[in-house]
Amino acid sequence: MNQQQKYILNLQRKSRERKREQAFVIEGRKMFEEAPADRIKMIVASESFCKSKEGAALLKGKKFDVVSDSIFETLSDTKTPQGILAVVKQQPYSFEELLGKEKASFLLILDHLQDPGNLGTIMRAAEAAGVTGILMSSDCVDIYNPKTIRSTMGALYRVPFVVSEDFAGDIERLKKAGVSTYAAHLGATISYEGADYKKPCAFMIGNEANGL
């Protein structure tokens, strides 16, 4: 295994490597097709994928490296690899970008989520619901975890998000910016039907086991 392949494996397996390199790995045709071209650092394809009509069409005009199917299986994080992966630069977002420019802020605030699949699914659903951004506590699972990336189904490229190092402080910043925050509580006296969601607002979601 060469240095490039070791680099890919480290990005697949280690959160600290993804953070240090400011990069992550995507797999499969959909994630590859939707990836912003200017953020793709490296493309790797399996021999069988390159020989397929689908692969030849997808890779036409692109610079990529070819590896054997067995090597690709080693590099892949999935049980049934699709034959194409890429290393992509992470996209940093500012706190201001969460607030939305063209419409009222509609945010999610995620506290201590631990399941990679849950985080990805939430991001995918958030995009469908029109969320303008996501604020996450620093103890949430890594958003660039391979399972999270797959679960986003491409929403990762389009929904701004910030991992907060001052979670309580940033929530206060949202409130000062005119964003109302909402969370479900068994002892609450206000029905969810009574709130005005047309104004800037944020919904809080807590840990899978312990809530907020």
Name what the model sees in each region.
Residues 1-53, 140-141:
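Boundary-proximal intrinsically disordered activation/regulatory segments immediately upstream
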Residues 24-26, 41-47, 66, 180-185, ...:
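Short, hydrophobic beta-strand segments that form beta-sheet elements in well-ordered domains
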Residues 46, 67-68, 87, 137, ...:
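Generic beta-sheet signal
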Residues 51-61:
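Short, aromatic/basic amphipathic alpha-helical patches
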Residues 59, 84, 151-155, 198-202:
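Short, hinge-like loop/turn segments at secondary-structure boundaries
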Residues 59-89:
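Glycine/small-residue-rich loop that forms an oxyanion/phosphate-binding "nest" at active or ligand-binding sites
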Residues 95, 99-188:
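RNA substrate-binding interface of SAM-dependent RNA methyltransferases
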Residues 182-212:
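Active-site/ligand-binding-proximal alpha/beta "capping" segment
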